[in-house]
């Protein structure tokens, strides 16, 4: 079936005027290559997630059209998918039922105002825990929807020659000086005491190619961030076959989220994770847990978890569960137009 998707963000802009779509695509390409030349992360996480969503739906045999305002206006009862930043998309006045995500879900008060201007049927978060940031009475609007990981683009690298024991992925976002004292410095000292080689990278300061090369030469990854709604970089490492040692305190650190949370919220840095993937730790038990992790490192199989639960196919199927419910209400069939293999996408 034809699935209209809309995206507005730093990468791709939703332009509602003649020639807007090719202009937006040109702008996206220029931005991508400029950031690549600067050595910065060329695409935002939202845009990577959006591209993966589109690819997963094409794999299921659906036809994707992006930022096609003409189609949406000609078919006002036809459900559409919105991704990226929601507020800019509200200005276009589309009446279609909307499945929102992946993207930056506005705070509850702002979202309530946007619902007066848009037909928001379902709003998604990448995992379950962020839904708890919203008032209890509004939670029926929300659903978890992860974005699939491209396991072909992030292949199993476990058989490559390894020269680095630990890839230390630093995505600390709040109270960095404090976290350097109670988290990062103790980890570095622990690895040094164990005689392990370490490569440290910082979120936002590497390209996908640099990250992939780091994964290829590393035996394991230590993932340090306060909490994630999905955690694409961690899951890309898991897809590449690296066991994960994940810092996971279960505490809400984002001040903006602390202000809006109606009650206790228990976040996670690895919301999609099981015993095949690696181990979690806190600042209080890092040494004990790391020794356990290192001794068991050959017994973890993180790629199996990703292929089973987080592949592009699984991501597309989850989208269609939610999108199909909107189509059922509108009497629109959801059969794919053609079978497609992953190799042809």
Task: List each model region and its residues.
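N-terminal pre-catalytic "stem/leader" segment of glycosyltransferase-like enzymes
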Residues: 1-85, 313, 317-322, 330-338, ...
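Conserved catalytic-core segment of nucleotide-activated headgroup transferases in glycan assembly
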Residues: 40, 136, 147-208
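Extended catalytic core of nucleotide-activated donor transferases of GT-like folds
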Residues: 48-122, 128-130
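Donor nucleotide-sugar binding/catalytic pocket of nucleotide-sugar-dependent glycosyltransferases
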Residues: 121-132, 138-154
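Short alpha-helical donor nucleotide-sugar binding micro-motif in glycosyltransferases
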Residues: 214-218
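A short hydrophobic beta-strand element within the catalytic core of glycosyltransferases
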Residues: 221-222
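Aromatic "clamp/platform" in nucleotide-sugar-dependent glycosyltransferases that forms part
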Residues: 226
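Catalytic binding pocket for nucleotide-activated donors in carbohydrate/polymer assembly enzymes
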Residues: 230-309
């Amino acid at each position: 079936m034809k699935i209209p998707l809309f995206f507005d963000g730093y990468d791709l802009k939703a332009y509602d005027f003649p020639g807007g779509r090719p202009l937006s695509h040109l702008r996206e390409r220029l931005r991508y290559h400029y950031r690549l030349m600067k050595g910065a992360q060329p695409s935002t996480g939202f845009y990577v997630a959006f591209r993966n969503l589109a690819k997963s739906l094409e794999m299921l045999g659906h036809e994707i059209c992006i930022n096609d305002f003409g189609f949406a206006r000609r078919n006002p009862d036809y459900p559409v998918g919105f991704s990226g930043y929601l507020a800019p998309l509200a200005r276009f006045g589309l009446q279609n039922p909307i499945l929102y995500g992946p993207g930056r879900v506005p705070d509850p008060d702002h979202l309530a105002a946007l619902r007066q201007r848009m037909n928001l049927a379902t709003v998604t978060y990448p995992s379950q825990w962020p839904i708890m940031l919203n008032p209890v009475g509004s939670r029926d609007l929300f659903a978890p929807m992860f974005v699939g990981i491209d396991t072909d683009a992030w292949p199993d690298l476990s058989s490559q020659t390894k020269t680095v024991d630990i890839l230390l992925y630093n995505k600390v976002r709040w109270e960095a000086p404090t976290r350097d004292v109670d988290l990062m410095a103790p980890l570095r000292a622990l690895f040094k005491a164990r005689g392990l080689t370490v490569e440290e990278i910082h979120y936002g300061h590497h390209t996908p190619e640099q990250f992939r090369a780091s994964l290829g030469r590393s035996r394991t990854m230590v993932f340090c961030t306060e909490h994630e709604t999905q955690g694409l970089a961690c899951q890309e490492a898991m897809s590449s076959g690296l066991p994960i040692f994940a810092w996971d305190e279960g505490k809400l650190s984002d001040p903006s989220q602390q202000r809006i949370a109606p009650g206790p919220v228990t976040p996670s840095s690895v919301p999609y994770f099981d015993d095949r993937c690696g181990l979690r730790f806190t600042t209080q038990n890092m040494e004990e847990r790391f020794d356990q992790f290192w001794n068991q490192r050959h017994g973890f199989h993180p790629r199996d978890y990703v292929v089973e639960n987080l592949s592009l196919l699984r991501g597309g199927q989850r989208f269609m569960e939610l999108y199909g419910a909107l189509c059922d209400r509108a009497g629109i069939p959801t059969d794919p137009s053609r079978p497609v293999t992953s190799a042809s996408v």
